[in-house]
Amino acid sequence: DIQSGFIANVGLNIFNQYVLESLDESIESIKPVIKPDIKLDCFWGSSIPKSYVDADSERIDIYKRLEHTHHSKVDEVKDEIIDRFGELPEVSNNLFITAKIRSVLSEKNILRCKIRESQIELFPVDLTEEVNLRIKTLDKKFIFRNKRLVLNFKDVLTPDSVYGILNSSL
């Protein structure tokens, strides 16, 4: 039998190669993105109190949305929640900032972060020349040893200031 059309023009082997490459691309595009489990220990509370959102299922949905939201889009989710449930209690506002921090940490492949009132400890960190220069512009002292970066500050940190530091320095 004589082949015609596209297969005849390119040959069966090349056609099979096109099909396999196309399948590889399709499979790659549907693979779930697995985010690493980030250990974040901070000194502020962050939650959605039952007094703010009564239904457990709605609170869980908000937590899930925040878990999968890029830090640049967290404020959009926050605005939706405020529109629906009213002004956020401080502990819930902290939750949205904490979600931004988690997203930045995930983006930078930092698996552990401990935040104290005047200190941020990160691990692991690859201290590139660019990151090193940005860190030196901050008003603080830092220690870098064994892929662990410890930033010490004079002033007490706020959730917003921690997010700003991590987003701009790493």
Q: Residue spans of the language-model regions?
A:
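Accessory helical-bundle/CTD segments and flexible terminal tails appended to RecA-like ATPase motors
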Residues: 1-170
